[in-house]
């Protein structure tokens, strides 16, 4: 019996929450993509305009085909938005989030001109690390899995064979000694800590072993042994100690994607020594004695650490030896964890495909310098992201999703499905060209008209200087305006967009930050200054994407300020006009009256964790707005963690839960912030 609002399809493990039936072009798009996959097409393109419900279409295709899926987005902000939406559509299935877990990342580098070596430095976001581990666990355990990720998925994460071979399967009644369980946990990179019980740790009290799985957000496992036999397995809350569920069986997954069996490490040590001998011989023959001394000293230290501890700092640079791969072979990535029949969706593909192709070259240039000057062995070059052709060789059946497909999608797609008609009946905005020499004064007048109707305005300029000057000019004339620029971090950017929707201010000025995936139904006017200056920011695709920001409003309008009409402008205006004509015709044929979008304003990462709540018990907490840098946030996180544990020790569980919720809110704020 399916719950109300849920839809199931024959042979599919997914339960799709569908509060409304597909409408507009959605039914035809869903049918076309499903048929294309069934026909064995490798590449398809969903050409979906802004606001046409592309995510809903993707969700329907996944649910109907019943296969695991990987959805790639060009950045963490859009990945979080997609993740939240997919969680809404599939609340009963495994929707996972796989992005870079670095809050801060400074790669190892050498600058020969200054003889400057820069050590690797990074800060790992534990919450995202837990979500990455949860993603691979779901792929190995269940078919109803959807992973939402970024280009982080083409970076090496450890061999899936080694990872799967290291799991610890526990069943009630199994014969296993306490010593064997502890040895297996240590080999899986869990740490024993009887005092501070956190994710990736275990503690021992007599015959009872508590394990906090690395991929679990909130529940731990209690294993009770009697006479070298598993007596009970229980899931419990680590904070309160309350038992939630008794289990007949539990699988403990490794504490890291990079776990390696001991025999593999010993084998790798021998091959690293062999490569070191070859490299020393090369440097000596070339008279590079400094480089020879440098590589010998660094590598021998790493070998000693591997021998004694099983890992070393920068172990990823020896990944080729640990995986047993041949020189030049690509590293194992998340894509190797996907089943052969999985689906792939590349959202905003005109941007994402370019990123997939560009990651390898930048990484290679930096590492070649390290190898040349004796900081790393040549095998370090194989610790790298996939090249585009390697990614293509590993791709599953794929759908490119974009309002403006690029040349790559056009050349590869066997089937192009258009989704131009919106379910709401909204049509693409009218596009108007006005003279550039009076653009600022004209824009001010237009802004006042829109503000009087309580609507919002987006303005895009060509340079940072012009954005700043325009923002100052508008502010001097009484306009509530903000400026969005590249120095603003991800979380603050999300808050600015949220404030625009809430009406804290009316006009947002930016350069290249107003294009893909910004969902702002309140925006009725998009103004593009200097639209006739040909280049990346005024290309056909950029113009169509920017014009599309006004397509979610009933009174959507776009003004291009230009003294001449360029080829890019002409093509963008023709395409917008074609779509608008098709939409108006569809509305007329079906008697549809366009209606505006009323979308609740919510935190972008809603659904990643429970919504934050306020509690009187935390009156001393620092307001989120006051935490402007990483150090302040780190201090507040430590303070809240200590407060939570103090309350728990004193059996003040309500206050402990309040501190935990405040901690969750703060970690949510940090969640989107990262490098890749």
From Swiss-Prot:
Pinpoint the Helicase ATP-binding domain residues.
35-192
Q: Which family does it belong to?
A: Belongs to the UvrB family.
What positions does the record give for the motif labelled Beta-hairpin? 101-124
What's the short name of a Pfam family annotated to this entry?
Answer: Helicase_C
Q: Where in the cell is it found?
A: Cytoplasm
UniProt-annotated binding residues for ATP: 48-55
Residue limits of the UVR domain? Answer: 634-669
Name of protein: UvrABC system protein B
Q: Which lineage do the record's taxonomy fields give for this organism? A: Bacteria, Pseudomonadati, Pseudomonadota, Betaproteobacteria, Burkholderiales
Q: Which residues form the Helicase C-terminal domain?
A: 439-605
GO CC terms in record: cytoplasm; excinuclease repair complex
